From Swiss-Prot:
Species assigned in the record: Methanosphaera stadtmanae (strain ATCC 43021 / DSM 3091 / JCM 11832 / MCB-3)
Gene3D superfamilies the record matches: 2.30.30.30, 2.40.50.740, RNA-binding S4 domain
rRNA-binding in keyword set: yes
UniProt family annotation: Belongs to the eukaryotic ribosomal protein eS4 family.
GO terms under biological process: translation
CDD domains reported for this sequence: KOW_RPS4 (cd06087), S4 (cd00165)
Name of this chain's protein: Small ribosomal subunit protein eS4
GO molecular function terms noted in the UniProt entry: rRNA binding; structural constituent of ribosome
Stretches assigned to the S4 RNA-binding domain: 43-105
Keyword presence, Ribosomal protein: yes
Keywords: Ribonucleoprotein, Ribosomal protein, RNA-binding, rRNA-binding
UniProt-listed InterPro entries: Rib_uL2_dom2, Ribosomal_eS4, Ribosomal_eS4_central_region, Ribosomal_eS4_central_sf, Ribosomal_eS4_KOW, Ribosomal_eS4_N, Ribosomal_eS4_N_CS, S4_RNA-bd_sf
Gene: rps4e
């Protein structure tokens, strides 16, 4: 029984900070299964239905909803109540005619932003790296564990617009000075600003970015910057009406 608990459940006080749960109500909570997002960067699908949307009173009701294929993540029906849902995933529930994009609030917690139908056909994915594979082709290594073969036109840090569920590239946003960046970590999390300068280091230290916002400028790590557009964001963000 102890082993089962360690695999499928997690003590609430050990739950990642981004989980929207009360850690003192009960001892255990559901643990995410292996999937596209790491434990500390995701929440289980059951938590989305029960704790965030309130569509299920308990895990049993959430499992019934999922077993009926009533919930799609990035356009694919998901029945596993422990399936990990993370940043920029698109969650659709056709029976209630609602679609949401997973974002972060100003405390770093995962939240759902309801989106219009026209915005539900794509998701944004950041390029973490590039690999040359057999035949000289370029493989893009993306957030969420995805790898896709594409032209060598993209750079690490660029963000792709992927059609879902096909996962085909429809457009891209370059990680460059002048672009709009959403901050995904550090004390400025969830703030949006313009990239003023990208500072490349020639040592083991991380690259940094100087961001400009209406409130002023700040320096952040390059890995915390998720570009979301040029003149304006291509998606609705936290705080937008």
């Amino acid at each position: 029984m102890a082993n089962m608990g360690s695999r499928k459940h997690l003590k609430r006080f050990k739950a990642p900070k981004m989980w929207p749960i009360h850690k003192k109500e009960e001892v255990w909570t559901t643990k995410t299964s292996a999937g596209p997002h790491a434990l500390e960067e995701s929440i289980p699908l059951v938590m989305v239905l029960r704790d965030i949307l309130g569509l299920a009173a308990n895990s049993r009701e959430a499992k019934i909803i999922l077993n009926n294929s009533d919930v799609l993540v990035d356009g694919i029906p998901r029945k596993n109540h422990r399936f990990p849902v993370g940043f920029m995933d698109v969650i659709s529930i056709p029976k209630i005619n609602k679609t949401f994009r997973v974002l972060q609030d100003y405390k770093g917690r995962l939240v759902l932003k309801e989106i219009e139908e026209k915005d539900s056909t794509f998701k944004l994915v950041k390029i973490l790296g590039k690999t040359t594979i057999k035949g000289g082709k370029t493989q893009l290594n993306l957030e969420g564990g995805r790898n896709i073969i594409a032209d060598d036109d993209y750079k690490t840090g660029d963000v792709l617009l992927l059609n879902i569920p096909e996962q085909k590239i429809s457009d891209s946003i370059k990680f460059e000075e002048g672009a709009l960046g959403l901050i995904t970590g550090g004390k400025h999390i969830s703030e949006v600003g313009k990239i003023d300068e990208i500072k490349i280091t020639q040592s083991s230290k991380s690259n940094t970015v100087l961001m400009e916002t209406e409130e002023g400028s700040f320096l952040t790590l390059a890995r915390y910057v998720f570009v979301v557009g040029q003149d304006k964001p291509v998606i609705s963000l936290v705080g937008d009406n």
